[in-house]
UniProtKB/Swiss-Prot annotation:
Keyword terms: Cytoplasm, Methyltransferase, S-adenosyl-L-methionine, Transferase, tRNA processing
Taxonomic lineage from the root: Bacteria, Pseudomonadati, Pseudomonadota, Alphaproteobacteria, Rickettsiales
GO terms under cellular component: cytosol
GO MF assignments: tRNA (guanine(37)-N1)-methyltransferase activity
Protein family membership: Belongs to the RNA methyltransferase TrmD family.
Protein name: tRNA (guanine-N(1)-)-methyltransferase
Length: 235
């Protein structure tokens, strides 16, 4: 199933940007996923193509207008009535591997990128938007966050990453833990050596070492992820 992604933005020239490179870009060229970028400004009715205005009640900055954004959303819905609506927002649910995986099951998603001080709340009240955040910090707009979301989803689609084992072994996928350390040639570099176990050829012991390292790193750096794991098998 092809994933079709619609992006609503006032800066359409930002796309595909980084999404045109590496495995994500190759998947785009192969049609494994499609990108449709919609310029919100093109739906403004005045000669200046105004997309923002001062907030009611006062306050700093400008707010993106509901009538303009609504027209852009209606255009998308007229062609894809079942599209999954997503708004990139610091108030949203924090993006994780599970959410990325769930979104790949949709054939069509639409991502709204805000700017300025945000969008008129009535957009979220009128439409069925799912708000997603990529972290507890603020960006100047939703476009970069949107790219993070798209890449996190697309790389999970079968056929995008050639070695599917890479996805199975990486952080947050295997038992919801952080990934174990990785090494490659040379075996010795500036006085630092690759752990002997990785050079032993004993795959049973190597796999146990990887599991142990993954658990220990997760316990140290993200202890909340290990709450449901029986650590006795790793220690």
């Amino acid at each position: 199933m092809t994933l079709n992604v619609n992006v609503l933005t006032i800066f359409p020239e930002m796309f595909p940007g980084p999404l045109s490179y590496s495995v994500i870009g190759r998947a785009l060229n192969k049609g494994i996923w499609n990108l449709n970028v919609i310029d919100i400004r093109s739906f403004a009715k005045d000669k200046h193509k105004t997309v923002d205005d001062k907030p009611y009640g006062g306050g700093p900055g400008m707010i993106m207008k509901a009538d303009v954004i609504g027209s852009a959303i209606d255009e998308v819905l007229s062609k894809n009535k079942n599209t999954k609506l997503i708004y990139m927002s610091p108030s949203g649910v924090k993006l994780n591997q599970d959410i990325s995986g769930q979104l790949t099951h949709f054939s069509n998603i639409t991502v709204l990128c805000g700017r300025f001080e945000g969008i008129d709340k009535r957009i979220l009240d009128f439409y069925d938007f799912h708000e997603i955040s990529i972290g507890d910090y603020i960006l100047s707009g939703g476009e970069v966050a949107c790219m993070v979301l798209i890449e996190a989803c697309v790389r999970l689609i079968p056929g995008v990453v050639n070695n599917t084992q890479s996805i199975c072994d990486e952080s947050f996928t295997l038992n919801n833990q952080l990934e174990y350390p990785q090494y490659t040639r040379p075996a010795k570099w500036r006085g630092l050596e690759v752990p002997d176990i990785l050079l032993s050829g004993n795959h049973k012991k190597i796999n146990l070492w990887k599991a142990n390292q993954s658990y220990c790193i997760t316990k140290q750096r993200r202890p909340e992820l290990t709450d449901t794991i029986n650590g006795d098998i790793y220690e």
